[in-house]
Design a protein with these regions (language model features):
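Aromatic (phenylalanine/tyrosine) cluster motif
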Residues: 6, 10, 24, 36-37, ...
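An acidic, glycine-rich, mixed-charge low-complexity segment common to nucleic-acid enzymes
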Residues: 42-84, 88-90, 97-101
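Nudix hydrolase/Nudix homology domain
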Residues: 44-45, 51, 62-63, 69-73, ...
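Conserved Nudix-box catalytic region and its N-terminal flanking loop in Nudix hydrolases
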Residues: 68-78, 128-165, 170
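Acidic, metal-coordinating catalytic segment for phosphate/diphosphate chemistry
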Residues: 81-124
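Unchanged
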Residues: 150-237
């Protein structure tokens, strides 16, 4: 799959809220039963949230969800609000590496989960140069992909490019499609934060000098070939590993 297929305008919320399925639904004949089946099936498939807490994962899904999950995951039912609090504590303290909390209304569960955190939106890129190398940054001893907070009033897609430019000193970025969205939590000054990060496909020239943004704790910026890329993956965050496993990203990187 060529990188050019990923370059062009893309609407973040279309993927986040599941609107990409509209193309599929539109192909079905106009009989009410067929349309109802398509919409119902798509809703069932989409009803799932995956949140990374430290090195563990909490999955929120409906009882109807048909998405596959790790067989080693612990499964619990969401009956009342205290179930969410207990699930968060269990995952956060490392008692369970993967916990699935399932209930009748996944959106209600999601709102309950979010009530325990301050939500911050961020954006970044999976950046590939003309040599098919991937851009990585080293921050606090861990390899990461360049990203940063979306400023007030700023468009997510613009923030993604700006953050990559600032953190790595690269120029001439071509922003493409949204590759995925990740959720992870952390603490800042005793406040629990939930970060929602939008990841875009990006390309740029390899003929430029990289410079880490030291004030942001970044000590190294590299273009990684396949061997170096795999080395970075072995020392990165679980949310990044999960992002790179997504089919759309795998096709984009061609590794």
């Amino acid at each position: 799959m060529r990188l050019s297929q990923y370059i062009g305008e893309f609407h973040p919320e279309a993927q986040v809220k599941g609107l990409l399925g509209c193309n599929f639904i539109a192909l079905i004949c106009n009989r009410n039963s067929a349309i109802f089946f398509a919409v119902s099936l798509f809703k069932i498939i989409q009803q799932m949230y995956r949140i990374f807490i430290n090195d563990s994962v909490l999955i929120l899904r409906s009882f109807e969800s048909i998405l596959e999950v790790d067989e080693q995951s612990e499964i619990q039912s969401y009956i009342y609000a205290s179930c969410m609090k207990k699930a968060i504590s269990k995952v956060q303290n490392g008692i369970c590496k993967s916990l699935i909390l399932q209930g009748d209304d996944v959106e209600h569960m999601w709102r309950d989960f979010c009530s325990h955190y301050q939500l911050i939106e961020a954006a970044g890129g999976v950046v590939v140069n003309s040599k098919s190398e991937v851009l990585w940054i080293l921050r606090n001893g861990k390899w990461d992909l360049p990203k940063g907070k979306v400023e007030f009033g700023e468009k997510v897609k613009d923030a993604a490019v700006r953050e990559v430019e600032e953190e790595c000193a690269v120029i001439g970025i071509n922003r493409g499609a949204l590759l995925g969205v990740t959720y992870h939590t952390y603490s800042c000054k005793s406040e629990a934060i939930l970060k929602k990060t939008y990841w875009y496909a990006m390309t740029c020239s390899s003929e430029q000098v990289l410079k880490p943004q030291l004030e942001e704790g970044i000590t190294e910026v590299v273009w990684a070939d396949k061997t170096k890329h795999l080395s970075c993956v072995s020392n990165t965050y679980t949310s990044i590993v999960e992002l790179l496993k997504q089919e759309k990203v795998v096709h984009y990187l061609c590794f």
